[in-house]
Amino acid sequence: MVAAVARLWWRGLLGASALTRGAGRPSVLLLPVRRESAGADTRPTVRPRNDVAHKQLSAFGEYVAEILPKYVQQVQVSCFNELEVCIHPDGVIPVLTFLRDHTNAQFKSLVDLTAVDVPTRQNRFEIVYNLLSLRFNSRIRVKTYTDELTPIESAVSVFKAANWYEREIWDMFGVFFANHPDLRRILTDYGFEGHPFRKDFPLSGYVELRYDDEVKRVVAEPVELAQEFRKFDLNSPWEAFPVYRQPPESLKLEAGDKKPDAK
């Protein structure tokens, strides 16, 4: 009896010492091993492409174009399963109202409203409405266009959230929204000149604000180094390395010209 108890005690002691030695090492059995094949896709999968949603959005975009052919000019689906609808400026209210109230749409949330300035276009400003449908868990992007002088209809009557968004666009880009209840600047100071997000707005601005010790207040003065337009033709740092320079183009010889002698 005593010998059997001694053997059990000795086995327990050996097991405890083995657990103590292996306490600092991770258990292989508890760690799942993930094996990847050679052809595994290593692209980010934050928002993977969904073929089912892609087909549904494409079908819905075609449906919107059939319902509102007067205003819808182009429909496409982005890589992140977001539908983009390009419309005529006159169709802002009809299209947004349709997308908000239609049973198969229900885009009742205006997530964002912004603008893009492309000076090379005839209608340089692109107005972008980002809508969200909580009912169907889908997004849609409505785009339209305008220029510096042509006003665009305000969307406040459809989405109340467009109020401050349109004020910000007016302040930063100078796009005028007709029938807006309170279209005034929202970010810049009183008496600010110009619209900072336009591509032709000078980087240094027109006015410099500083504190004057003589008059004991903040004064506004014209900027001495003001530039009228942004200059994108800058010197490249790679020009310091002759190896990376492109070889000079050879002169094209006209009929009757002689080839210049090599030096």
UniProtKB/Swiss-Prot annotation:
Main location: mitochondrion
Family matches, as InterPro entries: NADH_DH_suC (IPR010218), NADH_quin_OxRdtase_su_C/D-like (IPR037232), NADH_UbQ_OxRdtase_30kDa_su (IPR001268), NADH_UbQ_OxRdtase_CS (IPR020396)
Gene Ontology biological process terms from the UniProt entry: mitochondrial electron transport, NADH to ubiquinone; mitochondrial respiratory chain complex I assembly; reactive oxygen species metabolic process
Sorted UniProt keywords: Electron transport, Membrane, Mitochondrion, Mitochondrion inner membrane, NAD, Oxidoreductase, Respiratory chain, Transit peptide, Translocase, Transport, Ubiquinone
Transit peptide feature range: 1-35
Residue intervals passing through the bilayer: none
EC number assigned by the record: 7.1.1.2
Alphabetical list of PROSITE patterns matching this protein: COMPLEX1_30K
GO (cellular component) term, any one: mitochondrial membrane
Keyword Membrane in annotation: yes
Catalyzed reaction equations: a ubiquinone + NADH + 5 H(+)(in) = a ubiquinol + NAD(+) + 4 H(+)(out)
Enzyme class at the top of the EC tree: translocase
Membrane topology: Peripheral membrane protein
Gene Ontology molecular function terms on file: NADH dehydrogenase (ubiquinone) activity; NADH dehydrogenase activity
Similarity field: Belongs to the complex I 30 kDa subunit family.
Task performed by this protein: Core subunit of the mitochondrial membrane respiratory chain NADH dehydrogenase (Complex I) which catalyzes electron transfer from NADH through the respiratory chain, using ubiquinone as an electron acceptor. Essential for the catalytic activity and assembly of complex I.
Subunit comment: Core subunit of respiratory chain NADH dehydrogenase (Complex I) which is composed of 45 different subunits. Interacts with NDUFAF3. Interacts with RAB5IF. Found in subcomplexes containing subunits NDUFS2, MT-ND1 and NDUFA13.
PANTHER family to which the protein is assigned, alphabetical: NADH DEHYDROGENASE [UBIQUINONE] IRON-SULFUR PROTEIN 3, MITOCHONDRIAL, NADH DEHYDROGENASE UBIQUINONE IRON-SULFUR PROTEIN 3
Classification via HAMAP family: NDH1_NuoC (MF_01357)
Identification of the protein by name: NADH dehydrogenase [ubiquinone] iron-sulfur protein 3, mitochondrial
Organism annotation: Gorilla gorilla gorilla
Source lineage: Eukaryota, Metazoa, Chordata, Craniata, Vertebrata
